[in-house]
Amino acid sequence: MPSIHPSIDNGITKGDPNFKGGKLYCHCPTRKVEVTLAGNVAHNHACGCSKCWKPEGALFSVVGVISKDAVSVTANGDKLHIVDESAAIQRNACKECGVHLFGRIIVDHPFKGLDFVHAELSPQKGWQEPQFAAFVSSIIEQGFHPSEMDAIREKFRKVGLQPYDVLSPTLMDLIATYTAQKSGKLPAKL
């Protein structure tokens, strides 16, 4: 079976709930882009969408969110570019090696104010471990054979991750609440 993700394939290492953050680095051999995260990630998950950066040979990325105020480019920011300026999540990647360092939402969106990051780009240990798998069926759109999907979902379950074809129920509830508040169906403050 192909690799789901290096941090998932052989079991998941638990993170440290008191972890204070660290630095992410692109894969360039020199003049690496450095991004400092002043805190741990939340909602860390395996993502099968076609937009997220994935390690070579992996079917899924592992991505979490952190307040955009806790994210700062601390070295070689001149090497960053936005992969797709029309996307809701503006993924900032290294122009040279292609690694995505952070994704920022600048349009009106339920997750505006949160940046999407790949904690695996950090040498520090203690980041929140993956909590679930999202957009699992999306790997079919990238050429994965549909007949093998049950095995993928079972592999996630074996390591303790619930596979979803959207986001987790908690995140879907947040999106629905945001939408209801914007439309006036729910009060702005609950």
Curated annotation (Swiss-Prot):
Annotated pathway: One-carbon metabolism; formaldehyde degradation; formate from formaldehyde (glutathione route): step 1/3
GO biological process: formaldehyde catabolic process
Catalytic activity: S-(hydroxymethyl)glutathione = glutathione + formaldehyde
Residue ranges constituting the CENP-V/GFA domain according to the UniProt record: 19-165
Keyword terms, alphabetized: Lyase, Metal-binding, Zinc
Keyword Lyase found: yes
EC number annotated for this UniProt entry: 4.4.1.22
Keyword set includes Cell cycle: no
Domain of life: Eukaryota
UniProt binding sites for Zn(2+) 2: 47, 49, 52
Names of the cofactor(s): Zn(2+)
Enzyme class: lyase
PROSITE patterns hit by this protein: CENP_V_GFA
Residues where Zn(2+) 1 binds: 26, 28, 94, 97
GO function term, MF aspect, one: zinc ion binding
Cofactor binding: number and manner: Binds 2 Zn(2+) ions per subunit.
Summary of the function given for this chain in its UniProt record: Catalyzes the condensation of formaldehyde and glutathione to S-hydroxymethylglutathione.
NCBIfam families per UniProt: formald_GSH, PRK05417.1
UniProt cross-references to HAMAP family, sorted A to Z: Formald_GSH
Similarity annotation: Belongs to the Gfa family.
Name of the protein described by the UniProt record: Putative glutathione-dependent formaldehyde-activating enzyme
Organism field: Pyrenophora teres f. teres (strain 0-1)
